[in-house]
Amino acid sequence: MINSVLALGFDDTKFNWSDLTPIAVEHKKLSSENENNVNKAIDANTSVIGIYASHDIVSASGLIGAFLTIDAASLLGKSSVGNDDQWVKDAGALRDLLRVTRTLKSEQKEVITKTLGENAYSAFNALIASASRQTKTILVGPGAIALGFVALRSNSKLKDYLLVANTPVVPAITEAIKFMGSKVIMNTKENVHPLAELALAVSAVKASEL
């Protein structure tokens, strides 16, 4: 039974959680304290951990693509932008990033921080802590899904507790989800506020338990 949510890394200044769900939520920014935040929340019977790391498709694809043999253009997919000039720019940036990440893929912390930043490694550790304690962990956005992908490459036992909130229309993310085998809660492919996406996903999971 879902009674409360710990939301890590979400911006709660532009969206009112209670507009979508009455379930209690606690917010924490991404920091080195996140693993401790997760353990404390679970000890206090929090039932869901939501994680958001980044909405940057190039960065997330750079992390996922480090472990794949797919080229930059195919990882991005033509439909990911819809603007040819921006797509060419993104494909070039991703190609350059992959040259770096593919040499770092054996160094977990380095490849995560190089793509998604220092705080993303804190989110990664929080994600592992949550799933290891058999707590539903909802991944929102490309960055969090990429972190889940990396986590499952190291520990497949986490799969049953990692849930993907929604499916972005980007091949790199699709490939990651396919490898993970995790449940995708929604398949709207709509671009909504990350916190709204978490609220909708939590409500869907709660409804499925009734």
What residue spans do the PLM features occupy?
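N-terminal loops that bind phosphate or other acidic moieties
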Residues: 1-210
